[in-house]
Amino acid sequence: KEELEYKVINIDSNLSDQGIAEESVDIVIAAGMMNNAVNTDYSMRQIICSLVHGGIALIAEPVGENYELMLSQSFMMSRPTDAREVCNETFLKMEEWKEVFWGCGISERELVVVPSDTSPLAPLNQKLFIIRKE
């Protein structure tokens, strides 16, 4: 009988130090927290390394500056040390997200992004990044 195990993690710290071995996780669900990581590149690499082959990461995040979220969240967010610091932005743009994924070794065929740019939901500037590690 398989059991579901879940953990709350510190995304800014090494996952192996938190008891999560490389290639040991089947699924990661992260909603609205990657943009609060000190360094999104580092945190995403940690997540991808923790996934087993065939594992899935579901990452829901705003893309681009989202003034509604900035009004409340920017006061609680960590000071970034990644592309957001360089560009003085709160949230990564779509192209910056892709650079994060490509930098982690994720290929285009491993990544699905919804909603599409033509969706009625597109103006909300929220994306779900679905990654299946090969």
Each PLM stretch: what is its role?
Residues 2-14:
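Conserved SAM-binding strand-loop segment of SAM-dependent methyltransferases
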Residues 6-9, 28-31, 59-62, 111-114, ...:
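Generic beta-strand/beta-sheet core signal
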Residues 12-17, 35-38, 64-70, 99, ...:
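Flexible loop/turn segments at secondary-structure boundaries
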Residues 15-28:
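A short acidic, Gly/Pro-enriched loop at the edge of an enzyme's catalytic core
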Residues 25-40:
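A short SAM/SAH-binding and catalytic strip from SAM-dependent methyltransferases
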Residues 41-56:
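A short glycine-rich, Lys/Arg-flanked "PGG" loop and its adjoining helix->strand segment in the class I
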Residues 58-104, 108-115:
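C-terminal alpha-helical "lid/dimerization" subdomain adjacent to the S-adenosyl-L-methionine
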Residues 104-106, 113-134:
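Core SAM-dependent methyltransferase catalytic element
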